[in-house]
Amino acid sequence: MEITKRNGMAEPYNKEKVAIAIRKSFASTGQSVTDETILTLVNEVENFILSDTGNRHVERIQDEVERSLMEHGFYAEAKNYILYRWQRTERRKALNHIVNETGDETITDTLKGIGQDFPRNEYSLTLLAEKFSSFYKPEMTPDERLTALIKAAVELTTQEAPDWEFIAARLLNFQLSKKLTEQAEFAGVLSFYEKLRYLTDEGLYGSYILASYSPEEIEEAARFICPERDKLFNYSGLDLLVKRYLIRTRSHEPIESVQEMYLGIALHLAMPERHNRLQWVRKFYDLLSKLEVTMATPTLANARKPYHQLSSCFIDTVPDSLEGIYRSIDNFAMVSKFGGGMGMYFGKVRAAGGNIRGFKGVAGGVIRWMKLVNDTAVAVDQLGMRQGAVAVYLDVWHKDLPEFLQLRTNNGDDRMKAHDIFPAVCYPDLFWRMAKEDLNQSWYLFCPNEIMTIKGYCLEDYYGEEWEKRYLDCVNDSRLSKRSMSIKDIVRLVLRSAVETGTPFTFNRDIVNRANPNNHRGIIYCSNLCTEIAQNMSAIETVSTEIRTEDGDMVVVKTVRPGDFVVCNLEIGRA
């Protein structure tokens, strides 16, 4: 026996569907019902179907369910069943409206899935259709219509209905899937291995992946992919991955799905494994795709690519020389190019008004160099994905501290501002002890180059009691020029900046260096952008510059001592 569906298609009659509908009507009123009652009602509906061979439409069958419920006195259940049918009708209308307005019938399954997974009234497709209609314009392209539909779901997100963000993510994933299908057809790829071969030939994928794995291993790994895990994302997370981390063509079209990205990262990370390598690929893929762990930005962005710089955090010591300062800025540009964040210690750079080669008062101070760092962070933006990120550290006793503490504030001389970097201050214990004793005490600021020239040592190279002894020695040395401020005024500047900009960050150098297990081999001047790294630091130094003749051409060979250029990776797991 067959019945006619709403779309005119015929399908075999299934009495279990009728039973489920009746059970739901009782569940909606909180009333229990026996299997015998259910069977009686189902049999009555079935008898009608058998007797009326000319009208076996699904709507007519549902009418008979209503009649049967009311004949047996189940009026509340019949009422809820009628309401349920009306809501389903409204959802179908909304679904059809969205399909017609987007002009894409392939979105039907996605919309049905949303309706099934988010059945509550606040996530009704009717609301989505109404919001979408407010954005819809007839002249929109199909992709613009999808974007408007996604925007509609995003704008429906509220504190009372937060799951609209997950609905928006599903719609965004549908849009992404359509684009990926178009790109795959254009490239003529039918399998994951063919896609990797194509991307490698285009210079978008690291050749080392195909060199490390056989085609059979690649295809076996491809079977690990679980598209259902795309549903774990909310809109914000998926949108970020699509915009920043998926591989794109040179015309900026995505050519990699989120799950393919995770599998590519897993293939990269598992390359060194000698035993059961594909099992490790699967473990890494599962951890990533289930959102149980996330990698640092450079790993997400660069693993599997030709330039596979995976580290996230770097620290450089900026030396007090023109060559050294520009070398540090160049290093930051290269780190930023491949997704790393940077911490830069400027405590060795001479203060404004300092001497240069004996010429008095000509030094411009650290602010002008920090402005260059700021502009580098903005300019080197990882192919437009995001601008660079850098924290600049200065000692609380540095002469340029007051100007430094106003780098990001909105008042004052705009030529002394750098709004796109993150200032941080290095404090000794002495500063906090004096602040606790009496905020009105004087604190003295010095030029590090002047201390080195007159005293013969670098004050920033010490910590703890030795630093305090040398600091007081500098305070009492009349040959050194000093800038005096009350501790209260310094704290006021710090708090004003913190309230207005969220900076400066704090680095308590004495505490860190006392805990440093390698303090016999160097000193930790500062931390990185995230302020979680503490490793010995030293500046890169030029050893020699030599002019040679090679193959008849003059070449300049520069030898440098690398110093301690700090690097660290960061991964975050979910408890």
Which residue stretches match the model-derived regions?
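Extended catalytic cores of very large enzyme megasubunits
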Residues: M1-R574
